[in-house]
Amino acid sequence: MATRGHVYGGRKKANLYCSQCDEQDHCLESPQNRIRNTSGGRTSDHLCLFGRDCGKAADGTLNEDCSSALLEFASGAHGVYTQVFYARRDAAARGATVSGYMGTVRFDWCANELHRIRHHAPFSAVERASSDASHFGGDSELAHDFIGLIEGTTEPRTPIAAGIQSAYACLAARESAQQGRFVAVRQVGL
């Protein structure tokens, strides 16, 4: 897995808002240019994406602007995950593809679609999630579950073993990127 922070972050002063910047007329990330270019993102005044406080790899405060992972499963299936946060409009990219001998499944989180393709049959399917079922709300859902668990008002929707397994996968992915080789993912033994 590789993660990069090459686009955002930079030399602008910390806590700089677009409305305070003398480059807002030609900065592609300013609210007026996001509106003019229909490039998406927050169209109200916001912190500068090129400020020192946006993060950088050198000091461990990386603000990811893209990530990729190549996965190989025991069955021989391969998977690819990618997210490119600075890609906009029709080029927006965040998803995963897993292909085995019998078929391929592709997740497109920007379009809220799941594609299933059977390799040896003339059938394919596309499932579309409603707009309120977006993948992008995951962090707030995790926080909601955590608060409910602490307060004793709800049961978690996901077992702790799944969270630990996810952490193991992330640690293995980081080691794989650092070492430039495949790394076995430690398994949960609960």
Predicted regions and their residues:
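Contiguous beta-strand/loop segments that form the cofactor/metal-binding neighborhood of enzyme cores
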Residues: M1-N112, L142-P156, V185-L190
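Hydrophobic/basic alpha-helical segments enriched in Actinobacteria
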Residues: F107, A125-V126
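Glycine- and charged-residue-rich phosphate/anionic-cofactor binding loop of Rossmann-like
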Residues: R128-S131, L149-S166
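Short arginine-rich
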Residues: A169-Q179
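A general structural signal for well-ordered alpha-helical segments in protein cores
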Residues: D139, A143-H144, C170
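A short glycine-threonine-serine/GTX helix/turn-capping micro-motif
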Residues: K56, A129-G137
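Short polybasic amphipathic segments
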Residues: A96, N112-S124
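C-terminal lid/capping helical subdomain adjacent to the catalytic/cofactor pocket in oxidative enzymes
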Residues: I164, Q178-L190
